[in-house]
Amino acid sequence: MANRKYFGTDGVRGKVGAYPITPDFALKLGWAAGKVLASQGSKMVLIGKDTRISGYMLESALEAGLAAAGLSAAFTGPMPTPAIAYLTRTFRAEAGIVISASHNPYYDNGIKFFSAKGTKLPDEIEEAIEAMLEQPMDCVESAELGKASRINDAAGRYIEFCKGTFPAHLGLEGYKIVVDCANGATYHIAPNVLRELGAEVIEIGTDPNGLNINEKCGATDVTALQAKVVETKADVGLAYDGDGDRIMMVDHLGNKVDGDQILFIIAREALRSGQLKGGVVGTLMSNMSLEIALKMLGVPFLRANVGDRYVLEKMVENDWTLGGENSGHIIIADKNTTGDGIVASLAVLAAMAQHKLSLNELASAVKLFPQVLINVRFAGGENPLESDAVKSVAAEVEKRLEGKGRILLRKSGTEPLIRVMVECQDAELAQQCAEEIAEAVKKIN
């Protein structure tokens, strides 16, 4: 990826009111994107958002910029990120825009784009938009200005899409499901999908007020969900994040089931039904137990860098259709073009219904190895991971862990931190090894 000023791996993101998440920048970004897309023959762009209060401000500014460049905008209102990927395709729009900062707190927001195919914009288009941002803003002739409209049935369309991914011969009658929508974009989608498939649904995190998105709820904090599942004697709990592209689950005993376990359940079911194409892509942070469990099934496994963008890249590279992260981003490429929390959760529920097994039973094949993560701050300058002393300690630890665990040493891309991760079946050994490496890193300081 070329050096970017604004676009990161997941669009433009930051604190609301601080550049670039300001109304004037959103206006200019809408105009710049409009100019570039119009030059490709575009006429209409979809705009969706999550439930943050700043979404109103940003969607209005983006729409004004697009209109000035001659493009019309269609608003969907609060809608999960994967819904915008899907709706952009089905509405034959030239692009889709999502206003969201995913799992971040309400005071952050972001703007990202989808292509007409519902995939991330090609790098060259993002680079052209960045270049256009440096140009003075102008306005097309009045007769050529874009218009704004609202899509009133966007939620209903996406609900039907989600239900369509669930096997027609199965239903969720008899299941009691607690769903936590993080007070985010799935609040009016997920409960309806589950009810229409026959489940009894108990809702938490479905009362957004613009400020409570991801606050002690959703995929990043399942504590309330665990308590509610146990209290109501539910069969399963589902937790989505603020923009609906992540899923975490809770079994009937209140145990958290993470993205690695969810990925395994979906992979095994796809293998059984003959629908698994190739292998599975995880990340550098995927638990070693996932790799071992897949190996026992004869399923190839590859690790990508952390980030759903990199998972998807490796899937495309290998022509595989399944990948994900332990954080709950699960991409089932033959169903949607991006991580889709609702679709992934339905795939797991279908496996439960098909085999009449509990989530606890399905997840038991992946007994997660303890992971010890230590962040070591350093003074900047030389990267401690390049030091011979650190390399020597790391090599000695790797030898000790051979066959039983692994280490991962990463320099943070945003802070002067070295992240030391040790994973091992033996929790004490993992802790000891992580501390040894962390100590070696500290000495370099």
Curated annotation (Swiss-Prot):
Catalyses which reaction(s): alpha-D-glucosamine 1-phosphate = D-glucosamine 6-phosphate
Coiled-coil intervals, chain numbering: none
Posttranslational mods: Activated by phosphorylation.
EC number assigned by the record: 5.4.2.10
Positions annotated as active site in the UniProt record: S102
Physiological role: Catalyzes the conversion of glucosamine-6-phosphate to glucosamine-1-phosphate.
PROSITE patterns: PGM_PMM
Protein name as annotated: Phosphoglucosamine mutase
Manner of cofactor binding, per the entry note: Binds 1 Mg(2+) ion per subunit.
Modified residues (Phosphoserine): S102
Disulfide bond as UniProt keyword: no
GO CC entries: cytosol
GO biological process: carbohydrate metabolic process; peptidoglycan biosynthetic process; UDP-N-acetylglucosamine biosynthetic process
Named cofactor requirement(s): Mg(2+)
Keywords, sorted A to Z: Isomerase, Magnesium, Metal-binding, Phosphoprotein
Organism expressing this protein natively: Haemophilus influenzae (strain ATCC 51907 / DSM 11121 / KW20 / Rd)
The gene coding this protein: glmM1
Cleaved signal peptide residues: none
